[in-house]
Curated annotation (Swiss-Prot):
Top-level taxon in the UniProt lineage: Bacteria
Entry keyword set: Disulfide bond, Enterotoxin, Secreted, Signal, Toxin, Virulence
Segment forming the signal sequence: 1-23
Cystines in this chain: 33-71, 44-59
UniProt main location, coarse: secreted
Protein name, entry field: Heat-stable enterotoxin II
GO terms, molecular function: toxin activity
Pfam families attached to this UniProt entry: STb_secrete
Gene3D superfamilies in UniProt: Heat-stable enterotoxin B
InterPro entries in UniProt: STb_secrete, STb_sf
Length: 71
């Protein structure tokens, strides 16, 4: 159980860094929010194994990033 939680947190951390690097080139907040939403959609559609393949963490991390950016 601890291993799954650690993996989930690591996935969220890595995804948030990747999301920031991808979306940082956008200058318009509307465009930035649209890119964050698209990334969230793509990451939530990937995979089917949940925590074991990291998609649950990526999906959760993407949703948090969209909310954190005020979109």
């Amino acid at each position: 159980m601890k291993k799954n939680i650690a993996f989930l947190l690591a996935s969220m951390f890595v995804f948030s860094i990747a999301t920031n690097a991808y979306a940082s080139t956008q200058s318009n907040k509307k465009d930035l929010c649209e890119h964050y939403r698209q990334i969230a959609k793509e990451s939530c559609k990937k995979g089917f194994l949940g925590v074991r393949d990291g998609t649950a963490g990526a999906c959760f991390g993407a949703q948090i990033m969209v909310a954190a950016k005020g979109c």
